[in-house]
Amino acid sequence: VLGLKSTGLSNFVQSAGEHAQKVAPQTMLHRGICETYEAGTAVWSTVCGLKLAGQSEIEPNNEATQAACRIFSTTLDVLESNEELKREVFGPCSIIAAADSLEQMLTFARGLEGQLTAAIHGTPDDLREFAPLVRVLERKVGRIIFNGFGTGIEPCPSMHHGGPYPAASHSFFTSIGTGSIYRFVRPVCYQGFPDDCLPAPLQNANAAGAMRLVDGTLTREGK
């Protein structure tokens, strides 16, 4: 989580840490994921300049592979200079980093690997002011969210759950939504084929009345 260094951001870090203390540990999918989470946050805890802003006060049940919520805080300078902090730790944790300026945020964003989502929280005026950041994120993520979170994924025609590598192996395709069917197909061009040798949906008669693009025009008509 990136924000401009300010009293408001400091208050947010404090509030997030206090809320984390009240969050009960939750069961993760299996022991391997839980152990990787614990190992990852343990590495974070050794980084100089990274502070634990708050964590669940309730002890997790190891037998139930539970993980405790943890919120860390630091500066963007520390985040940029430590590769350990840039590696994903899957689970209920976040690092909140304070940036000195928009330009520093832009520099950091330009160095990001491909991501599934990015969220921007603020007012419409903030969104206009930070338009250069949106332009950078367009090249780094598959879905940009305003005042929302990436966990709400609606399986609808407009949904795109994918992103530039390594977030996905092919950034053109979504794994959620009606467009996800295209992960299982690929285009094939039949050039110069006799009409009767073409697959039925491509034959001039178009007996099934399928929607087709013919000479640049969408139509269900046959010939």
Residue positions per predicted region:
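Generic surface-pattern signal
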Residues: 18-21, 25, 42-49, 139-142, ...
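Charge-patterned, long linear interaction tracts outside catalytic cores
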Residues: 208-215
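Generic signal for short, ordered secondary-structure residues
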Residues: 84, 163-164, 207
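C-terminal core of ALDH-fold dehydrogenases
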Residues: 64, 102-201, 218-222
